[in-house]
């Protein structure tokens, strides 16, 4: 996207002259929406991000959260929507590679990946093409680099047919003493390591800062190299303690990396582009500055520690060059064959002006009068929905056991559980959630719902939530309704984080998610990280023969934005479920008090109580007889009781359990009753086939 007239004038005034071609490329890339957050950062500053256990929050490539004395976890989320729309295989693969490198910047070893994927209807040929190639790209990269994909969330909606939302989260672990030590000083070297620069991904950040109109240039999409990605992991593991700082070379290329490094350390940089190792010797300096060639890191290292880093790079056969160093002063200098092609003050380089767009609120469509449908047919429709169905066809393509750290695997529970071998039975619990329908109807309440859903998933498995990262994906901010959606979503996240006392330590905003003038439904994904003291006590979403079944929490008549409303009545209307933060916090305490004494548990969410019970039966391979009318509720309609998506609820199973007993697990038939009336009956195997994507 071209610089605006006002931005060009600001650059001319800041430089005191006309910018060079290389400087124009520098600013076009680094001042793009994708890199500068110029339309969003004013609002993002409002998000709460601090807590005693947060070692490093927002503002650098990756945060750090202390989960045990001297043991840190880093996790971060990234979007790769535009590239995945044009080249879904490489778009998804490079999204995974990029988020892994972000985690490497704090010296952490990547231990897990999660993905939040939003596609068009699976029966649509184009959506199916994107879906298949995105999943293959994630699978191929994750499997080859040796980082397991342990969970995520998948959503299908017409809005994402041509504009998918592809989000990747990486979790890494690092001992406190292994974090790069900082203390950057003049004379320290900038070592660029990884693939040689070429023209791949040229202008990728500018490409991600405009809407899709069809016929986009594939050259803006980067190409992944998981073998080199794995080598960089090995180098960081071996030489991370030798260096002072690590920076990912991602969006914006060298332009953004140099601007951020200079700004973070308040030092000048002298960088010789002609000393950079390249694969395309015909590339012009302005192209090398903004190239987004993948699998590259910048290591900041002192002259005396350079041999330690070089030894590791040579051992793993990673190409590298030493084209830059920190210098006194406040300018970024880039040299090319003896000529200074970039000479920019730090304050200007990292000083993209903020933009505030007009906002236009709207009200969601009112919930219409709904006829009560035949319940057996309604149950089949909801349970077979792609948004409720089990996603075995996706996660079975991932090697989720590589590294043997996955204690609760995809499909087994509400969240992934990872064992931390550094600390006995201590583990991490992590889950990401989003509901674009909710955030379309009410962006503020929808964002809060995404937060509490991920929080509750972590809690029900047995984790104590510690921190969160978020990803907000909307259309063009130049549309007043879209900009209002974004601002409202931030307010919802701020409220949820503050009320739940879970800091937001990082995030990503992706704008211009449109195709041919049509914005996607605003999509707010929240990934919550928690800790569990004993992974062997984690709750899976299943029961055993003879278990009693319990429901905790009250079902209210909240079907606005529900899967039932869309699937059975073809309507998207009403308000999303209300959020009771006290009830959500209570779930943490209740589950902790029962930890190790339950067979299993699952939260109640999309598809309502009916979907939660059916999931438990299918996961277990054991049927049940359940009287849903025993569940605590204030509704008078059976369809609302079955399909309401009220928050603050979960299902548990065991000899005893929290909440109200509603049935018993036994046999191979799943029966739903209301008192003496049979509402639904399916053999578990039949139910399993019905619920497969």
Curated annotation (Swiss-Prot):
Substrate binds at residues 79-82, 101, 222, 292-294, 510. CDD domains: PurL_repeat1, PurL_repeat2. Keywords: ATP-binding, Cytoplasm, Ligase, Magnesium, Metal-binding, Nucleotide-binding, Purine biosynthesis. GO terms for cellular component: cytoplasm. Pathway: Purine metabolism; IMP biosynthesis via de novo pathway; 5-amino-1-(5-phospho-D-ribosyl)imidazole from N(2)-formyl-N(1)-(5-phospho-D-ribosyl)glycinamide: step 1/2. It is an enzyme of class 6 (ligase). Mg(2+) 2 binds at residues 102, 248. Mg(2+) 1 binds at residue 78. It catalyses: N(2)-formyl-N(1)-(5-phospho-beta-D-ribosyl)glycinamide + L-glutamine + ATP + H2O = 2-formamido-N(1)-(5-O-phospho-beta-D-ribosyl)acetamidine + L-glutamate + ADP + phosphate + H(+). Pfam families: AIRS, AIRS_C, FGAR-AT_linker. ATP binds at residues 37, 76, 470, 507. GO terms for biological process: 'de novo' IMP biosynthetic process. Its EC number is 6.3.5.3. The active site is at residues 34, 80. One of its GO terms (molecular function) is phosphoribosylformylglycinamidine synthase activity. Its main location: cytoplasm. It is found in: Cytoplasm. Monomer. Part of the FGAM synthase complex composed of 1 PurL, 1 PurQ and 2 PurS subunits. Part of the phosphoribosylformylglycinamidine synthase complex involved in the purines biosynthetic pathway. Catalyzes the ATP-dependent conversion of formylglycinamide ribonucleotide (FGAR) and glutamine to yield formylglycinamidine ribonucleotide (FGAM) and glutamate. The FGAM synthase complex is composed of three subunits. PurQ produces an ammonia molecule by converting glutamine to glutamate. PurL transfers the ammonia molecule to FGAR to form FGAM in an ATP-dependent manner. HAMAP family: PurL_2. Belongs to the FGAMS family. This is Phosphoribosylformylglycinamidine synthase subunit PurL. It comes from Pyrobaculum neutrophilum (strain DSM 2338 / JCM 9278 / NBRC 100436 / V24Sta) (Thermoproteus neutrophilus).
